[in-house]
Design a protein with these regions (language model features):
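Class I (Rossmann-like) S-adenosyl-L-methionine-dependent methyltransferase catalytic domain
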Residues: 1-105, 126, 133, 141-272
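Basic phosphate/pyrophosphate-binding loop/patch that engages nucleotide-derived ligands
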Residues: 137
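A conserved beta-strand element that flanks and buttresses the S-adenosyl-L-methionine
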Residues: 114
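Short catalytic micro-motifs in class I SAM-dependent methyltransferases
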Residues: 117-121
């Protein structure tokens, strides 16, 4: 299904930040365990490395760095959700409200960045490419970045991921997905929780831990996702000339890529 780009952009700008502000409390309560692959990356960095957590959510990686006594410089942290940032500050960390496509940091200064479960919320190929370029611009030559996104394929080597194992599902072959009308016009497929993805662009409902979450309309608790096909993240990275792919792995239903900023030659602007 091909969706209108204006509709997808509307979902990013007008809907997604409101959703995370609405569900911030129950979302934060459910996000406490860091991904092992992200922690391996952070632990591999030299002492004193300075980096950014882009789309920091409730700050769980800021907490993990502190709890593991990693000798990194204090991380820059940002997110689009004001209420999630309240949770970050409540944990004793500084963070700013910022969009991935308009980060408030100077370019070429950081040793690393992590961007976990953020890029898959950007609703067009161009916005996803621009997001990677935005992060790449922050790195100094030789700097590293980790980008993690949700995978469309929730089976790996014949086994279901924990996401699917947490629910019961039947074969989705031949299933016609329900479509949800969204403000601004148009419709987008509604993905049933804990079932295999049958489209790459979907709305996913939030199963609120706190049943008292108030919502003004049906869409207010639905998050837009673009789930990545095999090789899709690598293909995007290949379009950013200043980056080279170091590693790409599949971890429990996610694609995770580590990239390196190519050292610029003398007089070269290497941020594209």
């Amino acid at each position: 299904m091909i969706l209108d780009e204006d509709l997808l952009t509307f979902l990013n700008i007008s809907i997604l930040p409101q959703v995370y502000d609405t569900i911030a409390g129950s979302f934060s309560d459910s996000r406490y365990a860091p991904w092992p692959g992200v922690m391996r990356f952070l632990k591999s960095l030299p002492p004193g490395s300075w980096g950014a957590d882009i789309g920091c959510g409730n700050g769980k990686y800021l907490v993990a760095v502190a709890q593991n006594n990693l000798l990194l410089s204090p991380l820059l942290a940002s997110d689009t959700s004001i209420r999630l940032l309240d949770h970050v500050r409540g944990r004793g960390f500084d963070a700013v409200a910022a969009n991935l496509l308009a980060l408030p940091y100077r370019s070429g200064l950081l040793d690393f960045f992590i961007c976990v479960a953020v890029l898959h919320h950007l609703a067009t190929p161009q916005r996803r490419l621009d997001g990677i370029k935005s992060m790449a611009s922050l790195l100094k030559g030789g700097g590293l970045g980790l980008i993690q996104v949700w995978a469309k394929d929730q089976h790996w080597k014949g086994k279901s991921t924990m996401y699917l194992k947490s629910g019961k599902f039947e074969s989705t072959e031949g299933v016609v997905m329900e479509e949800v009308a969204v403000p601004g016009g148009g419709k987008i497929p509604l993905q049933k929780l804990r079932t295999p993805f049958v489209a790459t662009d979907v709305l996913l409902p939030w199963n609120a831990v706190n049943k008292k979450v108030e919502t003004p309309n049906k869409v207010a608790l639905m998050r837009y996702y673009h789930v990545f096909e095999t090789g899709e993240l690598e293909n995007l990275i290949a379009q950013v000339s200043c980056l080279e792919l170091v590693e790409s792995v599949y971890e429990q239903g996610n694609w995770s890529a580590i990239v390196r900023k190519i050292e610029p030659t003398l007089g070269e602007n290497n941020n594209e």
